[in-house]
Structures are given as C-alpha cells and as structure tokens.
Amino acid sequence: MATSVKKLLAGLSGEVFKVPPVWMMRQAGRHLPEYLETRARSKDFLDFCYTPSLASEATLQPIRRYGMDGAILFADILLILDAMGLKVAFEKGEGPLVEQINGPSDLARVSPQKAADRLSPVYETVSRVKAALPAQTTLIGFAGSPWTVSLYAIEGRGKTDKSTAWRWAHGRPDDLAAVMDLVAEATAEYLARQVEAGAEALMLFDSWAEGLPDNIFREVVIAPTRKLVALLRERGITVPIIGFPRGAGVMLPEYVRETGVTAVGLDTAASPAFINAELAKGFPVQGHLDPLLLIEGGARLDARVRELLDAYRGRPHIFNLGHGVRPETPIAHVERVLELIRNA
C-alpha cells in the first residue's frame, strides 16, 4: 500500500502499514532526564504548562530522543477549568485540586466564553512545536472529555472515589448536564484554536469512564462526546479525532458507533479478539501495551509487543500504551519496544 509522509495521520485516515505508526501517551514526562531539567525551570506545574518555551520543549523531547510518529501537546486536561475561572492547583502527594462546584449557583463564576482566550499560551506552544517538528511527525492536540473534566470540578480533587459525581449522574442529571454543556462549549473552542495553531489531529481523554452502569455511560460519556465532536465539526474542524474512553469495556463498540470519533484509544484491559470482532476492520484503533509491563521489560514485554502487532495486522493500528508512560520506566525498555515495532 502507498506510504505517506505523515504515517500517523495516514493511519488515522484508515491506511494500513506493515510497520504501524507509534507514539506513547505521556511520552513527554518524568522518565526523561531532559524533561526533569526543563521542569525545574518553572515555579510550578501550571506555570510550566502556560510557558510556551518550556511546554514546547517538553513536547519535542521524545521526538528528538525516540523519533515518535506523533508529538502530543504538553499540557493538562485541567487547564480548561483553570481558564474557565475555577482555581486549579497541583499539590505534591495530593494530585490536582480544583475549586469545587456544588450546584447550579456556582456556575455563575464559570466563563466558557473567556476560557479559550485565556489559553492563548497553549496555542503559542502548538505553533512553536509545529514549526520545529520533522515533516513526518503528526502534531496531536488534546483535551479532556466533558465527563472527566466535569468530574474533577464536582469532586474538587483527583484523588477521589468519584462518588459525588456518580451521585450527580443518578440523582442530579440536569445539574450534571449543565456543567458538562459548559465544559463542552469551552472545550470545542479550545480544540478548534489548537487546530488553527497547527494541531493535525485531536485526542479526547475520558479517563474516568470506567465502571459506569451502561445507562449512565450513555448519558455522561457517549452523549457529551457526541456533542463535542459535533461542535467541532460545525466549526469546520475536519482533523481526525481519537476518543479514549478509558475502561469502557463492552460499551466501547457503542461509543465508536455513536460519538463520531475517527479512531479509538484502547486501554490496557482491552482484548484484541474482542476489538477485532466488534469494531469494523477499517476503523483505526490505538493502543494498548500495559505501561507496567513496559517498566518490567524482558521476554514478556517482547512477546506482548509481537502479540499486539500480530493481532492488529491488516487493520489501521497506531501502536501506543493503554495508559501513560510512568516515571520509573527505563528508557531502554521504550527503545526496545520501538526496535521491535520498527523491525516488524
């Protein structure tokens, strides 16, 4: 089959490769010594994300080291809440802390209209990265999906059992929908501006999709994602959109059918047999090596990489992880995975 300069972009458009395109979630991060050096130049994590010279450098580091086919913008899914007017902080040992929304009256202090303008440093980061990337590398913009971002605002923190947001889904669906609508509106403009700045594909992270009852999954994951995708298309955004409903399980085929995403990210628990049986052969999939196995390395890592390559041979497949690269991951193990893929 004909090749393309931008292999990842071609894969998202349905092209099949003997050697699939590859990148890794959280490829720019604490497993890289150069990242730690760059991170030390900022006063805190938000400052790091909002400083284009630093965020662009972090985005480019794994491209220089590994030659990944995709460069994903270095940012955080909670920037949108910060820009909308909810105070966000990242405390060591606590994870993210967010100014909590307790009810409809709190929405008065949230401004989706102003959020996109406040995120202008992110668009500058995108432009800087685009100008510096090799011609064959696809630039991926991203945001959190409405459910996951709203959950942080409702819970007020990242370390949570999610019960408050789940109770809203069951008992206060109209209030939850109001929050998610505001998030979707702000996120659509945010992502559209990323594309205008140079992003060639987009990814929607629904990190808290796991474990939801099927009816609630439809209401808080599928419906808001469908709305967000529609808002982007209405704005004339035509780039591929990768949906990543982590932990969707048996709801994944319905998510693919109903949301309008171009491709789907698979989590660590996904079964290749299930994916190949339930998703159309021409639908692009991305994933899904276990990041903990990437830490361990050895013969089992080699075997799993080959197993995933074989399982998705003949369909559009972007090799990735089922979750992000962890800080303790040896660089040599990442290099080994890339060697196996590139010699497939």
Swiss-Prot record:
Q: Which Pfam families does the record associate with it?
A: URO-D (PF01208)
GO function terms (MF aspect):
uroporphyrinogen decarboxylase activity
What residues bind substrate, as annotated?
R26, Q27, A28, G29, R30, D76, Y152, S207, H323
Pathway membership, UniProt: Porphyrin-containing compound metabolism; protoporphyrin-IX biosynthesis; coproporphyrinogen-III from 5-aminolevulinate: step 4/4
EC primary class: lyase
UniProt-listed CDD domains: URO-D
Q: Which GO terms describe its cellular component?
A: cytosol
Catalytic activity from the UniProt record: uroporphyrinogen III + 4 H(+) = coproporphyrinogen III + 4 CO2
Which cysteines pair up through disulfides? They are: none
The positions annotated as site (Transition state stabilizer) read D76
Subunit and partners: Homodimer.
- What does the sequence similarity comment in the record state about its family? Belongs to the uroporphyrinogen decarboxylase family.
Name of the featured protein: Uroporphyrinogen decarboxylase
Upper lineage is: Bacteria, Pseudomonadati, Pseudomonadota, Alphaproteobacteria, Hyphomonadales
> What gene does the UniProt entry assign to this protein?
hemE
